[in-house]
Regions:
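Amphipathic alpha-helical interface segments
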Residues: 104, 108-177, 181, 193
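Short, Lys/Arg-enriched N-terminal segments with co-localized hydrophobic residues
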Residues: 3-18
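Polytopic transmembrane helical bundles with strong interfacial aromatic enrichment
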Residues: 21-30, 145, 192-193
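Transmembrane signal-anchor/signal-peptide helices with a preference for the extracytoplasmic
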Residues: 65-77
Length: 233
């Protein structure tokens, strides 16, 4: 889908190249610079959910980097098998979070279409409400999966911080903070959608899981950060 918006950059060669590139590629194929350029535009995708997923992918990649700097070092021979397994898990989490960048954009499309449906007659109003409810559910599922995946990543980055190379421990701390931010950011995308849901029981269920993930993993990420700080200061 080509995103149509006006940012004052229409005559800019870089902007035109990005828009042409967008017709046949994924957001995760963009350069960092191009992704930020598109993110700063008026189009709703990529948005906060995709940005959160990307932040999470960067966060766990930092943990994976710590693992890469640990494997093969005699000092860490005793934990090498554990670190290798952690790196495999980190690769999987990274791939899933990058996929969620795309899925978040895809989930917004039916919601956007639902907002644009006519509501001139009782039948149209009823149909719009039905389609809107289904779209809101879909728009909650992706950020909830981002949260779940970031929670896995926080558990994993704790191991990188504890067992990984001490010269790179600060990178594990940075990764933990990014994953916490990604978790929190994804939760906001749940809350804004559940607020509009007619099925209050379903909305409460989504909110409950988001609240529980935040309660456990915001604290855990903070603990990792604080332990890293205590070791390097």
């Amino acid at each position: 889908m080509v995103k149509k918006y006006r940012t004052g950059m229409e005559n800019n060669v870089q902007w035109r190249n990005i828009m042409e590139h967008q017709t046949n590629s994924c957001f995760t194929d963009y350069s960092c610079k191009d992704f930020i350029t598109v993110l700063s535009g008026k189009s709703p995708v990529p948005g906060g959910g995709g940005a959160a997923a990307l932040a999470g992918a960067i966060g766990i990649a930092l943990g994976n980097m710590v693992g890469s700097l640990t494997v093969g070092k005699k000092t860490y021979a005793a934990v090498e098998k554990d670190i290798i397994q952690c790196k495999k898990k980190a690769d999987d989490i990274t791939a899933r979070l990058l996929d969620l960048v795309e899925k978040d954009a895809e989930a917004f499309e039916p919601l956007s279409a639902a907002y644009g449906m006519p509501k001139s007659t009782p039948e149209e109003i009823e149909k719009k409400a039905e389609v809107m409810e289904a779209a809101l559910v879909g728009a909650c599922e992706v950020p909830l999966e981002i949260m779940r995946t970031c929670a896995e990543a926080i558990d994993l980055i704790e191991t990188f911080a504890e067992k990984g190379s001490k010269i790179a421990i600060s990178d594990a701390g940075v990764g933990a903070t990014l994953l916490k931010s990604a978790l929190q950011g994804a939760s906001l995308n749940i809350y804004i959608n559940t607020k509009s849901m007619a099925d209050k029981e379903a909305a409460a269920s989504y909110n409950k899981e988001a609240d529980e993930l935040r309660e456990k993993y915001e604290q855990k990420a903070d603990e990792i950060f604080n332990r890293v700080c205590s070791k390097i200061r």
